[in-house]
A protein has these predicted regions:
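Extended, compositionally simple hydrophobic/Ser/Thr-rich segments
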Residues: 2-111
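Intrinsically disordered, low-complexity terminal regions
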Residues: 1-9, 83-168
């Protein structure tokens, strides 16, 4: 609870990374990975370097996440704000999710994008979110508020990690 957790370059090395049962933490994953799972995390700020595969977040709330990944999947999450570079994004059983464009920066990031086979100048589809519950909502007797929204472009300041020990 309330910790600052930092995984530096070489700590993950393209392997999977799991964040679970965190409360009021700041997490910096300053490396590239194959897959990232966030389970049962609440009131956290998370910066995740490029992910070659999927970023999964489940049973979490009040997260502020900056991440670059091939695919994002959220399930049973609420009140989360994500700044993304993603080829695809999908949510299921989520509420009040806000998406914005990638805003992260740290030393070595370009090499991590290359290692994860992501092109930062390429297609960022953070704004094309598939909601698995949209059909159910459309069939409901009463109209339902959208489960997700987009943050205006440029609304987020750059989250730049000046060194592995401190975020600016």
């Amino acid at each position: 609870r309330g910790e600052r957790l930092v995984l530096r370059e070489g700590d993950v090395r393209g392997q999977s990374c799991e964040l679970s049962e965190l409360r009021e933490c700041t997490v910096l994953v300053l490396d590239w990975s194959a897959q990232v799972t966030i389970d049962d995390c609440h009131d956290c700020q998370v910066l995740i370097g490029p992910v070659d595969g999927s970023l999964f977040a489940r049973n979490s709330s009040k997260l502020r996440v900056t991440a670059a990944c091939r695919q994002l999947r959220l399930r049973d999450c609420a009140d989360c704000t994500l700044s993304l570079f993603a080829h695809s994004a999908a949510i299921e059983a989520c509420d009040r999710i806000v998406f914005g464009a990638w805003n992260g920066a740290y030393a070595g990031l370009s090499a991590h994008f290359a290692a994860a086979k992501l092109e930062p100048g390429g297609r960022n589809r953070y704004d094309r979110v598939h909601d698995f519950n949209a059909d159910d909502d459309a069939k409901a007797a009463a109209p339902r508020a959208p489960r997700w929204s987009l943050q205006p472009e440029g609304a987020w300041a750059l989250w730049e990690v000046a060194d592995a020990g401190a975020a600016v």
